[in-house]
Regions:
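Extracellular carbohydrate recognition and processing domains
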Residues: 320-349
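Active-site-adjacent mobile loop/cap segments within catalytic or ligand-binding domains
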Residues: 267, 353-354, 360, 372, ...
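A short beta-strand element within beta-rich, extracytoplasmic domains
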Residues: 283-307
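Active-site microenvironments of hydrolase-like enzyme catalytic domains
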Residues: 159, 428-535, 563-586
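Residue-level detector of conserved catalytic or cofactor/ligand-binding positions
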Residues: 694-704
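Short, surface-exposed beta-strand/strand-loop-strand elements in extracellular ectodomains
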Residues: 305-323
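Pro/Thr/Ser/Gly-rich low-complexity, intrinsically disordered linker/stalk tracts
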Residues: 616-657, 703-705
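Non-catalytic propeptide/linker segments at domain boundaries
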Residues: 65-174, 370, 374-385, 413-426, ...
C-alpha cells in the first residue's frame, strides 16, 4: 500500500512539473549546437564572443532558451529572427516539437529586440517616448522651408566626448586623453560633431543642445543691460505702447574677467521685462556689439522664464547678409545661453550688426524678458585650483562605485565658497570650445550641483558626470522629467560621441561599439515607456554607421557589441540615450579612415539617419532624409545683368528617401554674408545683378525633400 501511494505521488509530481523536467533534459550537445548556430549567425554581422545557452525553461507551452549577453549584440531584424527560429527549431529533439520556441537574451525575446522603427507591423499600443511641445525652443522665422518629415520640434542633447580640464592631483590643465595620430580624442570627436553632425540635425529641423561651447571663434563679446565689462558695446531700449521695467529676481551680469569656485554669472545681475502686444507701436531692446575683427560669430541670447512667459519672443539678428529672425519660446530655457545661429559681422560697432528683441507676439499680455547677448566663443574664463578639501580618485565612467552616488535630482546652487585669495587659480589659456563641459556649464549659469558633483574636488569625474545630469536639468519640469527642477525643455534623446582606445598588432580594425543602459529608474521613462528604447536608438545608429562605412570605405569594418552596461553618461539621462565609441583613435587601421573628412561626413550622416529613424518612429511618422549635396554646378551670364546657376542632384544609393524635390539657393554680394535663401523647384536659378556690382557669390543649393 505504501509502495503504491509513493508511486501515485511520483506520477502526480511528474504531471505537475512535466515541462521543467523536460526542459532541464535538453542535452548538452544540443545546447552547444544551438550556441554554435547562433555564433555563426552573429558573425555574419558582428564581432562577438562565444554565444551559449545558459539555461532552459518552459512557460506554459513555450520552450524558452536563455542565451548569454553576446547573443544580444546581434542586430535583430524580422528576417534574421525568422531564420534563427527556423534553424534552432531544426536542432531540437523531437520531443520538443510540440512547444512554441522563444529565444531570450538581455531580458527580452529576440523579436522584442527588433527596433520599433524596423518592424513591419507598428504596435501603436506600445508606449513611445514622444513628448509634445507646442512650440520648439528656437524657430528660424526667416527660413524659406520647414521640414515636414524630419526633426522639426525635436530637441536633441549631444556632446563630443571629453575636453581640456584641470587635473588637481597634478595642479595643471591637460587633455583627458592621450595625443596620438595627429590628434587627441578631446578634439577629434569635435571634427564630426561641429562641422557635420550638428548642421545636419539643424538642417533637418532639430534644436540641438550642447554642454560645450560650439563656436571656434576665440573672440567673445558680451552685451548686457547691466553694462559691459570691456569695449564700447551698447544695450538700449525703445519704448512703444508698453514700457520696459526691471524684472523681479536675478539675471546675468558680467562683473569679472574670470570666475572661480561655484560663481554663477546668471545670479549676479538683473534682467528687463515687458508685456507683449499683438499690434500697435512695438517696444524693442537692442544689443549693439563692438566686434573686435571681421568674421563669423555664434550668437547666443539669454532671458528668464516666468509663469506667464511668451512662447514667441521675436529676435532679429542684423548681420553682413541682411537680417535673420527667430522666435524663441521663453517658456523654457531661461537663465542660460540659448544659441540662435552663426553670422558674419564686420569689425567695429554699427547698426548693421546687432540683435533686436521686439514685444510683438501672437498673444497680448504675456511677458517677454531680456538679458545678456553673447557673441563669439571666446577663451576659457573659469579659473581652477586644488580644493581646500583635497582631491578624489579619477573613477572611470563605468566604475561600479559611481552607482553608490548616482545623482538624486536635487539640482540647486550651493552657497558660494569665498576663498581668502585668488592666488594659484589657473585659467586654461585655451579657446573655450576646447574645454570640457564642466566649465561651459558654469559660464552658462547651470547650477553647480550639476557640473560639480564632487564639490570642486575632481574635475575629471565631474566632467563626465555633468553631461548626463545636464540632460536632466534641461528637461526638468517638462513632461519628459516632471519630478526634477530644470529648464522645461522636452528633450527627445541624448547622444554621447566618443572614440575608443585599444590597438591591434596587425592591420585589424577595432570598429564601432554602442552602449546604452536599461537598469535604472525601474527600467522606465517618466511617461512609462521602456528604457529599452535606448537599445533601439543604439541599434539604429550603429547599424547605419556600419552599413555605410562598409559600403563606401571598408567592407571589413568591425561591428562590435551593443553593451547594456552602467556607464554614467548612458545611465543617468532620463531620456533615450546612446554612448557611441566610433573607432579606436589609438589604432592605425581605424585612423586611416578616421582622419579623412569624407569619412567623417559619411559617419555623421549615418548618425543623423539613425536618429531620424528613431525619433520619427516614436511619433509614428514616416521619415525623409535630407538629400546629398548637389554637383555639376555652373554659373552662366544669360544677359548683361542676369546670371543663371545650374546644378544636378546626387542620388543616394544608401537611402531611397533622400530624393531632392526643392532647393534653397543662398546669395551674397561683394564681401557681405549669405542671405536667408530662396526656395526653388527646379535645378536652376536666375537672378538680376545689382547695378555697379563688383562680385557675387551664389552658394551650393541646400537640398530639401
Amino acid at each position: 500500500m505504501n509502495v503504491r501511494r509513493q508511486f501515485l505521488l511520483s506520477l502526480l509530481a511528474a504531471s505537475l512539473f512535466p515541462h521543467a523536467g523536460g526542459a532541464q533534459g535538453l542535452p548538452t550537445d544540443v545546447r552547444q549546437a544551438i550556441g554554435k548556430f547562433l555564433d555563426t549567425t552573429a558573425r555574419k554581422e558582428v564581432s562577438v564572443g562565444r554565444i551559449s545557452i545558459d539555461s532552459v525553461a518552459v512557460e506554459g507551452n513555450t520552450l524558452q532558451l536563455f542565451a548569454n549577453m553576446n547573443c544580444a549584440y546581434i542586430p535583430f531584424r524580422e528576417d534574421n529572427v525568422a531564420e534563427i527560429y527556423q534553424g534552432v527549431s531544426a536542432l531540437l529533439p523531437a520531443e520538443f516539437a510540440k512547444y512554441k520556441l522563444q529565444i531570450r537574451t538581455n531580458k527580452r525575446s529576440i523579436e522584442e529586440l527588433v527596433p520599433q522603427a524596423l518592424r513591419s507591423k507598428k504596435d501603436k499600443k506600445t508606449k513611445t517616448f514622444s513628448p509634445v511641445a507646442s512650440k520648439p525652443l528656437v524657430t528660424e522665422v526667416s527660413s524659406p522651408y520647414t521640414p515636414t518629415n524630419g526633426l522639426h520640434n525635436r530637441h536633441i542633447a549631444l556632446w563630443q566626448s571629453h575636453g581640456w580640464y584641470y587635473e588637481s592631483k597634478l595642479d595643471r590643465w591637460e587633455w583627458q586623453r592621450a595625443r596620438i595620430f595627429q590628434t587627441v580624442e578631446d578634439l577629434y570627436t569635435q571634427s564630426y560633431v561641429l562641422p557635420f553632425l550638428v548642421p545636419m540635425l539643424e538642417n533637418a529641423g532639430a534644436n540641438v543642445l550642447l554642454p560645450r561651447e560650439r563656436d571656434c571663434q576665440t573672440a567673445e563679446v558680451i552685451v548686457d543691460n547691466d553694462g559691459c565689462l570691456t569695449g564700447r558695446s551698447v544695450y538700449t531700449e525703445n519704448s512703444g505702447d508698453k514700457l520696459w521695467s526691471q524684472g523681479e529676481g536675478q539675471g546675468f551680469a558680467h562683473l569679472r574677467p574670470q570666475y572661480i569656485d561655484f560663481e554663477n554669472p546668471f545670479k549676479e545681475g538683473t534682467y528687463r521685462a515687458i508685456e507683449t502686444i499683438k499690434k500697435g507701436n512695438a517696444s524693442t531692446a537692442e544689443w549693439i556689439p563692438e566686434i573686435p575683427s571681421t568674421g563669423q560669430y555664434a550668437v547666443y541670447v539669454s532671458y528668464q522664464t516666468l509663469p506667464n512667459s511668451a512662447d514667441d519672443a521675436l529676435y532679429t539678428v542684423y548681420h553682413k547678409g541682411g537680417t535673420t529672425q527667430f522666435k524663441v519660446n521663453q517658456q523654457m530655457g531661461g537663465g542660460t545661453w540659448i544659441y540662435l545661429g552663426t553670422f558674419g559681422f564686420n569689425a567695429g560697432r554699427n547698426n548693421e550688426c546687432k540683435v533686436v528683441l521686439s514685444n510683438l507676439s501672437s498673444k497680448v499680455g504675456r511677458i517677454i524678458t531680456a538679458d545678456a547677448v553673447k557673441i563669439g566663443g571666446g577663451m576659457g574664463n573659469i579659473a581652477r585650483r586644488i580644493s581646500n578639501e583635497g582631491a578624489t580618485e579619477n573613477l572611470k565612467s563605468s566604475d561600479t562605485r559611481n552607482l553608490q552616488n548616482t545623482h538624486t535630482g536635487n539640482i540647486q546652487d550651493r552657497v558660494t565658497y569665498s576663498p581668502l585669495s585668488t592666488i594659484n587659480y589657473q585659467l586654461s589659456n585655451y579657446p573655450r570650445f576646447c574645454e570640457a563641459a564642466r566649465y561651459w556649464l558654469q559660464w552658462a549659469g547651470i547650477p553647480d550641483s550639476v557640473y560639480s558633483e564632487s564639490n570642486g574636488k575632481n574635475d575629471y569625474t565631474d566632467d563626465y558626470k555633468c553631461r548626463g545630469i545636464w540632460v536632466n536639468y534641461l528637461s526638468g519640469g517638462s513632461a519628459v522629467n516632471p519630478t526634477e527642477r530644470g529648464l522645461n525643455i522636452p528633450v527627445n534623446m541624448a547622444f554621447a560621441f566618443h572614440s575608443d582606445a585599444g590597438t591591434t598588432q596587425n592591420d585589424s580594425i577595432i570598429g564601432t561599439l554602442g552602449i546604452y543602459h536599461t537598469n535604472a529608474y525601474n527600467e522606465k521613462f517618466a511617461n512609462g515607456a521602456s528604457r529599452y528604447l535606448s537599445h533601439d536608438l543604439t541599434d539604429l545608429i550603429q547599424s547605419n554607421i556600419v552599413r555605410d562605412v562598409r559600403t563606401l570605405y571598408e567592407p571589413q569594418w568591425t561591428r562590435r557589441g551593443k553593451w547594456n552596461q552602467s556607464y554614467y553618461e548612458a545611465r543617468v539621462p532620463r531620456v533615450p540615450t546612446m554612448l557611441l565609441e566610433l573607432l579606436s583613435h589609438q589604432n592605425f587601421a581605424d585612423m586611416r579612415y578616421g582622419l579623412d573628412p569624407r569619412f567623417r561626413f559619411t559617419v555623421s550622416r549615418a548618425i543623423y539617419k539613425g536618429m531620424l529613424q528613431f525619433l520619427c518612429s516614436q511619433y509614428h511618422m514616416d521619415y525623409v532624409v535630407q538629400p546629398l549635396p548637389v554637383d555639376h554646378m555652373a554659373l552662366h551670364m544669360t544677359s548683361e545683368n542676369e546670371v543663371e546657376l545650374t546644378w544636378q542632384p546626387v542620388a543616394d544609393a544608401l537611402e531611397p528617401t533622400a530624393v531632392a524635390e526643392k532647393y534653397i539657393v543662398y546669395t551674397r554680394i561683394g564681401d557681405g554674408d549669405f542671405d536667408n535663401g530662396v526656395l526653388v523647384d527646379g535645378n536652376s536659378y536666375r537672378t538680376t545683378l545689382p547695378a555697379g556690382l563688383s562680385l557675387i557669390h551664389i552658394s551650393e543649393p541646400t537640398r530639401q525633400a
